[in-house]
């Protein structure tokens, strides 16, 4: 099958080439009257026998124009005007003058589509039959297309002319049958069908019934050469730049874009704006330019003296928030705050240690699960402890900041506890954060109603460490996390220290959770101010 198809294609190529070089002559008909198709074929044979004036050029082209000039055939004139003037149809009268009959805009392109397909428009059949001059040739109409759109001189515009043959279609044949049978004579259905068959035989081209594949390939090749630039993709591309499409784009450019295309319109305008900007970024070659900076003389005199006070800037030192002057302790000061609570079967006990070392005015803090055997380890100062222990201590700052940390951690424990909480305090050293006696433990607590003041939001919960130091079922955080919450980069204004009752213990009811933001000194100061 593949081999037979290749042979048919080769046969079609040979037939087309031989017909272009040496076309066979047709037999003369007995009637002596030739149709327009026979005239065109005879003209084709005649032109093929002539030698071309220029080599590599053919003379057997533009046959319809040559036939019209030889026999002065009547034509339908179609004028294509530039811009928005549209197009018009002209018919020639008996006196030889052309008269314009129809003028349409380019938006109404139905007639142009028929002309492009070389078909006779059915809507023009009645108009052409009423013409003073017969323009039908074997059922076909010769149309002359005059294109004024390429002319540059608008005062006396010239045009480019070409001729096309409009062939009848089944629609035009139906119109002819209807116009012929619309007289007073009674036509039966058989008479109408017979009339239609005779019209088809008179207007149709010769039909080849040879079942050879080469005939189909030859017809396909001839049709391809004639409609090579008349395909649907090519029409779609050319239609974008047609006059009707340009007019529609111009009308839509003044209208606001739809909401779905606002982004596309913005990008298009920005692209046009950037395209209009031109920058001269040419870099001259080395040696063609003069460096004026190097050529300018540099006369700088060395000053004999410099006024330092004139150019120096003095930065004021930051004053401490403590109302009390900085005290350098003579001994180590350590305060331990132990918080105890019982929830269900769990016993929780944590310890907050505030330490001030010898020769250091700053206070340090440490939060850890309280154990009796770790009492000796907690005595070690941050400056003398190991690397692991030193990482657990965090810098608090002044004495006021240390008191604020104690208050905040106490509020945190009472807000997070689901059971009564007991706090005990013990201090050692020359001075203590509280006014109690040295080394004597105290117990105190604050009512839960006071803790709710100033809290406007309900933040995520923070859990307390268990007594064993490990988190139980993910409900408690570690001591390092709590210490990180208590750090404050900028100390807030000092707040009044709440009074703690000695050796008193108050059970707390269930309270709500507190966020890490409540641990900062700033949030604590807001609650005390409120």
Curated annotation (Swiss-Prot):
Keyword Oxidoreductase: no
Comp. bias (Low complexity): 424-436, 466-475, 514-530
Region (Disordered): 419-530
One Pfam match: Spt20_SEP
GO annotation, biological process: gastrulation; positive regulation of gluconeogenesis; positive regulation of transcription by RNA polymerase II; regulation of transcription by RNA polymerase II
Sequence positions bearing Phosphothreonine: 490
Keyword Phosphoprotein belongs to the record: yes
Assigned GO CC terms: SAGA complex; SAGA-type complex
Signal sequence extent: none
Record-level Gene Ontology MF annotations: transcription coregulator activity
Key words, A-Z: Developmental protein, Gastrulation, Phosphoprotein
Modified-residue entries (Phosphoserine), positions: 296, 515, 520
Disulfide bonds: none
Assembly notes: Interacts with ATG9A. Interacts with MAPK14.
PANTHER family: TRANSCRIPTION FACTOR SPT20 HOMOLOG
UniProt similarity note: Belongs to the SPT20 family.
General function of this protein: Required for MAP kinase p38 (MAPK11, MAPK12, MAPK13 and/or MAPK14) activation during gastrulation. Required for down-regulation of E-cadherin during gastrulation by regulating E-cadherin protein level downstream from NCK-interacting kinase (NIK) and independently of the regulation of transcription by FGF signaling and Snail. Required for starvation-induced ATG9A trafficking during autophagy.
Protein's recorded name: Transcription factor SPT20 homolog
Organism: Rattus norvegicus (Rat)
Gene symbol of the encoding locus: Supt20h
